[in-house]
Amino acid sequence: MSLGLVGRKVGMTRIFTDDGEAIPVTVVEVGDNRVTQIKTDETDGYTAVQVTFGARRASRVTKPLAGHLAKAGVEAGEIIREFRIDAAKAAELQAGGSLSVDLFEVGQKIDVQGVTIGKGYAGTIKRYHFASGRATHGNSRSHNVPGSIGMAQDPGRVFPGKRMTGHLGDVTRTVQNLEIAKIDAERKLLLVKGAIPGSKNGKVIVTPAVKAKAKA
């Protein structure tokens, strides 16, 4: 994983290009990502940078975590994440420092990871886009049922992975190869072309795209 930023999904809006084209964008606030620890091969077995984002009341911070953050000289945040980096990049960073939007540039391809909106218990039509039954013509009380879930006495069981009703959403998902349409360095905002996972105020992780195609 490359060095990235932890941010907050503000919401969606649209911006206009110089040609007058409207582009739907998601606004991501990537305020101060405070460096809490630099991990190295010698001390931890791998190289990474650990960062915290947001704010948390002191009464909500455990004593071990408070000591860990005090060692780095940073305030407690809502979330702590780490990014795997190489030794050369780790040498440029230090605990107590911060990361900002200058890690990215306009037009760059990125991956955005977040927790999708929870939909609760959902049927197969909403969950897997099954077709509903006929409204009339002999159909009664079977309009939204999934239909048969198995065969006969042989095999006499429902195969694992059968698509059925159940919990929908509230899972971690990554959308790849999104494009940064605009950067507001003063307000520490990334305007990402398209939609990203999660609800408003949800925490997201922004990293350089791992499958970005080289420009011809």
Swiss-Prot record:
Q: State if rRNA-binding is listed as a keyword.
A: yes
Keywords, ordered alphabetically: Methylation, Ribonucleoprotein, Ribosomal protein, RNA-binding, rRNA-binding
> Which InterPro entries does UniProt cross-reference here?
Ribosomal_uL3, Ribosomal_uL3_bac/org-type, Ribosomal_uL3_CS, Transl_B-barrel_sf
PROSITE patterns, alphabetically? RIBOSOMAL_L3
Modification N5-methylglutamine, positions: Q153
Which stretches of sequence are listed as region Disordered?
A: 134-153
The organism sits in which domain of life? Bacteria
One GO BP on record is: translation
Gene Ontology CC entries for this record: cytosolic large ribosomal subunit
PTM annotation, UniProt: Methylated by PrmB.
**Entry GO MF terms:** rRNA binding; structural constituent of ribosome
**One Pfam family it belongs to:** Ribosomal_L3
Tell me yes or no: is Ribosomal protein among this UniProt entry's keywords: yes
Function, in words: One of the primary rRNA binding proteins, it binds directly near the 3'-end of the 23S rRNA, where it nucleates assembly of the 50S subunit.
Q: How does it assemble?
A: Part of the 50S ribosomal subunit. Forms a cluster with proteins L14 and L19.
Name the PANTHER family on file.
50S RIBOSOMAL PROTEIN L3 (PTHR11229), LARGE RIBOSOMAL SUBUNIT PROTEIN UL3C (PTHR11229:SF16)
The Swiss-Prot or TrEMBL record describes its family as follows: Belongs to the universal ribosomal protein uL3 family.
| Name of the protein in question | Large ribosomal subunit protein uL3
Per the UniProt entry, what species is this protein from, by scientific name?
Answer: Cupriavidus necator (strain ATCC 17699 / DSM 428 / KCTC 22496 / NCIMB 10442 / H16 / Stanier 337)
